[in-house]
C-alpha cells in the first residue's frame, strides 16, 4: 500500500501523503469488512513503528518525507556522541543508548544538513501520532514512543530542554506536542476524516502506543516474569520491569503502556525486513503467482525452506541490509554461495540469519 523510498544507501523514507491515503484505505476496508456499523464503534487508536521522524508545518502539511526506523543517515552524529561523552551524559536521564534512527539523531542531521526544512516545522511526530493528527487535527505525542527515542527524561517523565541541547536540538523544544498516556483521548474524528474513512464524526481517538508495546500486550506481556520476542523489521527481545535496568546490561529502557512499568528492550534492524527484501527483489514472479492463485507468498517461502535440510545448505546470510544496532554501516551478504545453490537455499539462509540475530 505504501512502498518505501530508498533514494540513497542508508536512507529509508515514505511519502507522508501516500502514507495517509494508505491508512485511510485500510481503515475504510476494516470498517466494511468487520460488518460493524460505524456508529457502534466506541473509539479508535493506533500503534506504529518506533523511532524515525515525521514533521509538519503550521498548516499541518508534511515538510519532508517520513523517515523510518531503518534509516541510518545520522550515523556520524551517534559516533561523535559516543566519543565526546554525550552518550554517558544523556544516559543519566534517558537510560538508553543512542541509535541512528532515533528522532534526536535524525533531527541533528537536519540541523546540519537541511536547516531550511526545520525552519518550517510546527510539530514533530512519530508515525502513529501523525496519522492521529490527520484524523483529529489535534497535535499530541505519546509516552511509549517518545520515551523510546531519547526525547524524554525518564526521571521526570517529561521533555527536558537540557537533554535536547546535549544533541544540539534545544531550539526545537517547542516543536514537540503535549505528551499523553496510551489510553488518553487525544481528539475526535473530524468530518473530513469521517468522509474519507467511513468512521463517524466525533468518534474518540486514543493516543495509542509504540508497536513493540502493542506486540507485548498481544503476547501477554503483563508481568515481570514474562519475555516477548518480536520478529518484525527489527529483531526485538523485551520484558517489562517496575524500574529501569541501568547496570549497563541492556540497551534501551522506555515507558510501557501499562502505567508503572518500563519496557526493557534489546533490538536490531536485522529481522524479517531482510525476508521482505528477498521477496521483493528475488521472488517477484512467485509473489504475483501467489496473488493470482489466492495464496500467501509465505506459504511458498515456508515450503521452500522446509525442503532444504540444514546440512545440505552450508550457506550463511548476514542480515545487515539495514545495518545493526551496534554497527549502523554494517552490510548484508551471502557467504559460501556456489553454483549448487538456488533461491531456496538462499531463502533458508535468510531465515537462519534472522533467527540467529535474535
Task: Cite the ranges covered by each PLM segment.
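N-terminal glycine/serine-rich phosphate-binding loop of ATP-dependent small-molecule kinases
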Residues: 1-65, 76, 80, 92, ...
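Glycine-rich, flexible loop/turn motifs
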Residues: 2, 7-8, 37, 52, ...
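Short beta-strand-loop/turn "lid" adjacent to the catalytic site in phosphate-handling enzymes
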Residues: 8, 32-69, 97-101, 132-153, ...
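Active-site core segments that coordinate phosphate-bearing ligands/cofactors
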Residues: 82-100, 105-140, 150-170, 185-358
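A conserved helix-loop-beta module that forms one wall/lid of the active-site cleft
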Residues: 168-181
Amino acid at each position: 500500500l505504501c512502498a518505501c523510498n530508498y533514494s540513497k544507501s542508508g536512507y529509508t523514507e515514505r511519502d507522508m501523503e501516500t502514507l495517509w491515503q494508505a491508512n485511510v484505505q485500510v481503515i475504510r476496508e476494516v470498517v466494511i469488512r468487520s460488518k460493524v456499523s460505524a456508529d457502534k464503534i466506541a473509539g479508535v487508536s493506533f500503534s506504529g513503528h518506533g523511532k524515525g521522524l515525521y514533521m509538519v508545518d503550521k498548516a499541518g502539511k508534511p515538510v519532508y518525507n517520513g523517515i523510518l526506523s531503518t534509516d541510518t543517515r545520522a550515523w556520524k552524529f551517534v559516533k561523535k556522541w559516543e566519543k565526546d561523552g554525550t552518550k554517558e551524559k544523556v544516559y543519566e536521564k534517558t537510560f538508553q543508548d543512542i541509535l541512528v534512527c532515533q528522532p534526536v539523531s535524525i533531527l541533528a542531521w537536519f540541523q546540519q544538513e537541511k536547516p531550511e526544512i526545520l525552519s518550517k516545522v510546527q510539530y514533530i511526530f512519530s508515525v502513529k501520532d501523525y496519522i492521529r493528527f490527520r484524523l483529529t487535527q489535534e497535535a499530541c505525542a505519546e509516552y511509549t514512543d517518545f520515551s523510546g527515542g531519547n526525547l524524554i527524561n525518564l526521571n521526570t517523565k517529561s521533555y527536558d530542554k537540557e537533554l535536547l541541547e546535549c544533541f544540539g536540538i534545544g531550539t526545537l523544544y517547542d516543536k514537540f506536542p503535549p505528551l499523553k498516556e496510551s489510553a488518553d483521548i487525544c481528539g475526535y474524528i473530524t468530518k473530513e476524516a469521517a468522509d474519507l474513512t467511513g468512521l463517524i464524526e466525533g468518534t474518540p481517538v486514543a493516543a495509542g502506543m509504540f508497536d513493540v508495546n502493542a506486540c507485548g500486550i498481544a503476547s501477554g506481556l503483563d508481568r515481570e516474569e514474562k519475555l516477548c520476542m518480536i520478529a518484525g523489521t527489527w529483531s526485538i527481545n523485551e520484558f517489562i520491569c517496575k524500574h529501569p535496568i541501568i547496570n549497563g546490561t541492556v540497551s534501551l529502557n522506555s515507558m510501557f503502556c501499562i502505567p508503572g512499568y518500563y519496557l526493557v528492550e534489546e533490538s536490531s534492524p536485522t529481522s524479517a525486513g531482510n525476508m521482505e527484501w528477498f521477496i521483493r527483489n528475488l521472488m517477484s514472479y512467485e509473489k504475483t503467482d501467489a496473488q493470482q492463485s489466492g495464496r500467501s507468498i509465505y506459504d511458498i517461502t515456508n515450503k521452500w525452506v522446509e525442503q532444504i535440510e540444514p546440512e545440505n545448505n552450508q550457506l550463511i546470510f548476514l542480515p545487515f541490509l539495514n545495518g545493526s544496532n551496534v554497527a549502523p554501516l554494517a552490510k548484508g551478504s551471502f557467504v559460501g554461495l556456489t553454483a549448487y545453490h538456488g533461491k531456496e537455499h538462499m531463502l533458508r539462509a535468510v531465515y537462519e540469519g534472522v533467527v540467529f540475530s535474535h
